A protein has these predicted regions:
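Non-heme Fe(II) oxygenase metal-center motifs and adjacent flexible, charged/small-residue loops
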Residues: 1-175
Length: 175
């Protein structure tokens, strides 16, 4: 990739290491039996993973229909189907660790992966309901490993309402 990006000034760890999913994990209950888990600093050395992914992932710029016009998606993306090899061994190890941790509770393993590259403060994601990778009728399993600059993840109920949850995601955090 031809642009210069910086993941973090704070994560100077030389080696990448996934820590225990359960240790330091906090669960926040949501409506209708849903919940969100936050595990700060799950990946040590997230900056090294960020640098590697920026260089090796074949990022895609997409356009989407939004109401009456077609607009640029304000981030770069790459989706990996269940039969595709993930672009870095740490991502494969992370997917296995997440599957091992959550399979008994959720009834299935993580199979696909979607990567997003937010290039600057203008890149973003709008309110949406994750449906990619959904293998069951009612629920969607989504795990997010943040390896770039810190940013907030905002969640709100699908059926509307004013209650929203703001999760500050730091370098190496898992949600």
């Amino acid at each position: 990739m031809s642009m210069t990006l910086q993941g973090s000034l704070l994560d100077l760890t030389e080696t990448m290491e996934l820590r225990s999913v359960a240790e330091g994990l906090t669960r926040t209950p949501l409506a209708h039996g849903a919940w969100v888990d936050l595990r700060p600093a799950w990946l040590a050395g997230a900056g090294r993973l960020f640098d590697a992914l920026v260089d090796v992932v074949p990022w895609r710029a997409e356009r989407r229909q939004m109401y009456d016009s077609v607009v640029d998606v304000p981030r770069l993306t790459r989706y990996y189907a269940a039969d595709e090899t993930l672009p870095h061994p740490t991502l494969r190890t992370a997917r296995e660790a997440l599957s091992d941790h959550y399979q008994a509770e959720l009834g299935e393993r993580f199979a696909t992966a979607g990567l997003c590259l937010y290039r600057d403060g203008r890149d973003s994601v709008a309110w949406h309901g994750d449906r990619f990778g959904r293998s069951r009728d009612a629920d969607t399993m989504v795990a997010i490993l943040s390896v770039g600059s810190p940013r907030a993840l905002h969640l709100r109920p699908r059926d509307g309402g004013r209650t929203a949850l703001r999760l500050p995601l730091g370098h190496g955090d898992l949600v």
